[in-house]
Amino acid sequence: MDEIKFGVFLPFYAFRTTKTGSSSFNLIRDIVLECERLGYYSVLLDDHLMLKKMPILECWTTLSALSSVTERIRLGTMISCNSFRNPALLAKMAATLDNISNGRLEFGIGAGVQKNEHNAYGFPFPSSKARIERMNEAVEIIKKMWTEEKASYNGKHYTIKNAVCEPKPVQKPHPPIIIGGGGEKLTLRVTARHADRYDWGYLASLELYKRKLKVLEKHCEAVGRSFHEIEKSCWPAGQIFIGENRKELEKRVLQLMPKGVILEDFMQTSFVGTPEDCIKQIRQYVNLGVTHFMLFFGDLPDLRGLRLFAENIVRKIDQIN
């Protein structure tokens, strides 16, 4: 069986630690360093420019800073919004980060979904079909920039001519490409064509995840690619709240859950349980061929859940295998 990996999705835009409400890079850095110490495989950041009035640091700049203070843990995006950056420039940024981090980049990319965010920053927000077409072309350009001496491309949405990206990424042939999204007609076809890893974030049920895998497998057949070449990744829950005492844990969830949300609804999209409960749920996905799990700890920046999961699951992975 392939190695099972656990990565942490870090909602760094949610941390308000100063009187002005500004995000604290020091806090983000300390959480990432703790993830590295505990043995997590990766930390992935979301790529948003604004979320209502919440403070948020720019994703790629933050990753660059984190890469200079860490040594082993892999760093990347879940996912980088294609609409925000020219793909040739994004390829250059990613190659630079892979060099700074000595080959630790996880490159996640998606078509973009937040219309208000695009409008506020002046980015076009065309139809879903057009955004996915753009993402497909962007990935083709990025792969060319990473692997060719001079890259040229003449597509419907993007054109480059003799573009040089030096130095190339440390990872060969290139950093792993994660394509985010679950659209069955278009996005999963792009995933079948280009992705090294499939991850759509949180899926509401094991049955829905099975369905997405079947659709992806059909697209792989259509484009002439082996379904087994693509690593399978998933989120076992929208948010994870893990504790040794379930009764005390549920009290904490009541304190941490968003105001105005019904507890039953919140529990349906979250995992609330003991390490043993979590292992049972993870095993179900392992049996489907999943080898990579993304974890969104709902109690961050409190480190108790992060540490408990590492001590009882990450460091005892043989129990799952």
Predicted regions and their residues:
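Conserved, mostly hydrophobic/aromatic
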Residues: L66, L97, F107, I142, ...
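Short, acidic/polar
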Residues: S22-C35, L90-M93, G181-V190, T274-Q284
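Alpha-helix-loop-beta-strand connector modules within alpha/beta enzyme cores
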Residues: I56-T77, R134-I141, F309-N321
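Flexible, glycine-rich active-site loops centered on histidine and acidic residues
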Residues: D2-S23, S83-S152, G201, E207-R211
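Active-site mouth loops of central-metabolism enzymes
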Residues: F12-N26, S80-P87, P173-G183, D265-E276
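N-terminal beta1-alpha1-beta2 module of alpha/beta enzyme domains
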Residues: M1-V69, P173-P175
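Hydrophobic faces of well-ordered beta-strands that scaffold small-molecule active sites
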Residues: F6-L10, V43-L45, L75-T77, L105-I109, ...
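An alpha-helical appendage that flanks or caps ligand/catalytic pockets
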Residues: D2, S127-P169, Y202-T291, P301-R304, ...
